[in-house]
Amino acid sequence: MQTLHALLRDIPAPDAEAMARAQQHIDGLLKPPGSLGRLETLAVQLAGMPGLNGTPQVGEKAVLVMCADHGVWDEGVAVSPKIVTAIQAANMTRGTTGVCVLAAQAGAKVHVIDVGIDAEPIPGVVNMRVARGCGNIAVGPAMSRLQAEALLLEVSRYTCDLAQRGVTLFGVGELGMANTTPAAAMVSVFTGSDAKEVVGIGANLPPSRIDNKVDVVRRAIAINQPNPRDGIDVLSKVGGFDLVGMTGVMLGAARCGLPVLLDGFLSYSAALAACQIAPAVRPYLIPSHFSAEKGARIALAHLSMEPYLHMAMRLGEGSGAALAMPIVEAACAMFHNMGELAASNIVLPEGNANAT
């Protein structure tokens, strides 16, 4: 049975030769070079992923939604009752939540995964529960390091199993009341930013309660002293089971050489952890949308990412990842279905990259 260390060691590097071939092919399509902008660079990125066999392509699509409750909810950092996590997880099994509707539109399957809901098991939800909610990060660690490592490995294996069954494009999502608080703590730690710069309203927290949320994040970091150079340490001390789960999806997909669409702010925090744990993950991550949450810009700048969509969204659940899946498919369609300049006897002069 593969260990977490072995999984991280075996993440493949992108295929530079395949990327060069893809770029050459794209430059020969019926258009001025570079005129399809980031659609072209996305196709080249996909071509370099070993799990796609040297060409941009999309097979089955899946959005993995990690569901968990958080002990820090007790600090008054969320407006929704904690039970909403379980209620919404059940609604996901019925296909009625935002991510389910958008994923269905994109032709993707939603996998609802319980990694720490504080309720009885829910029919139709995959059970990877570590505990009924994680610890309150304002007074101590979210979980033990062993719990974090075990969950990373379990989710990574689940992701790789889906890849073996034909999934070639993954999206990550989460569900958990109060989870923007640990996400903000993680972003603060990884980027060296003060909590005031990265704490936002989450799921409509009143402005009058923002200062308390900022204070909670600062206390969590001061009490737990997470090491920003150790991604697992940060996850276990100031993260949460859902954030660990999303990180595990990224590690597993990268191990299989396959792309992962990020969602919003919560997924940015998990991406920061994943890239700290295994920098080789970075080429497999695709930013979907620019979250409206306050700390989004800082997190994305640290990741050196520019999302494809600006929709003022902050729902979470994987909704942005699902919404961006057709963009990935469009990059593949461009690559495979456009005609070639040579076949039409068109010779473009050099310097036409900006032509329209």
Curated annotation (Swiss-Prot):
Alphabetical UniProt keywords: Cobalamin biosynthesis, Glycosyltransferase, Nucleotide-binding, Transferase
Catalyses which reaction(s): 5,6-dimethylbenzimidazole + nicotinate beta-D-ribonucleotide = alpha-ribazole 5'-phosphate + nicotinate + H(+)
Residues given in the record as substrate binding sites: Q88
Pathway the protein acts in: Nucleoside biosynthesis; alpha-ribazole biosynthesis; alpha-ribazole from 5,6-dimethylbenzimidazole: step 1/2
Binding site for nicotinate beta-D-ribonucleotide: E174, L175, G176, M177, A178, N179, T180, A203, F265, S291, R314, L315
Outcome of swapping L175M: Alters specificity to use phenolic compounds as substrate
E.C. no: 2.4.2.21
Gene deletion effect: No growth on cobinamide (CBI); double cobB-cobT deletion mutants do not grow on CBI and DMB.
GO MF terms held by the record: nicotinate-nucleotide-dimethylbenzimidazole phosphoribosyltransferase activity; nucleotide binding
SUPFAM superfamilies, A to Z: Nicotinate mononucleotide:5,6-dimethylbenzimidazole phosphoribosyltransferase (CobT)
Gene Ontology biological-process annotations: cobalamin biosynthetic process
EC main group: transferase
Site feature Important for substrate positioning, might be proton acceptor, where: E174, E317
Function summary: Catalyzes the synthesis of alpha-ribazole-5'-phosphate from nicotinate mononucleotide (NAMN) and 5,6-dimethylbenzimidazole (DMB). Able to use a variety of other nucleotide bases as substrate to create alternative lower ligands for cobamide.
HAMAP family from the UniProt entry: CobT
Assembly information from the UniProt record: Homodimer.
More info: In vitro assays of this enzyme are performed at pH 10 because at physiological pH (7.0) its activity is undetectable; this makes it difficult to assess the role of mutagenesis of potential proton acceptor active site residues (Glu-174 and Glu-317).
PANTHER family registered for this protein in UniProt: NICOTINATE-NUCLEOTIDE--DIMETHYLBENZIMIDAZOLE PHOSPHORIBOSYLTRANSFERASE
NCBIfam families hit by this protein: cobT_DBIPRT (TIGR03160), PRK00105.1 (NF000996)
Family: Belongs to the CobT family.
Name of this chain's protein: Nicotinate-nucleotide--dimethylbenzimidazole phosphoribosyltransferase
Organism: Salmonella typhimurium (strain LT2 / SGSC1412 / ATCC 700720)
Lineage, broadest ranks: Bacteria, Pseudomonadati, Pseudomonadota, Gammaproteobacteria, Enterobacterales
Gene encoding the protein: cobT
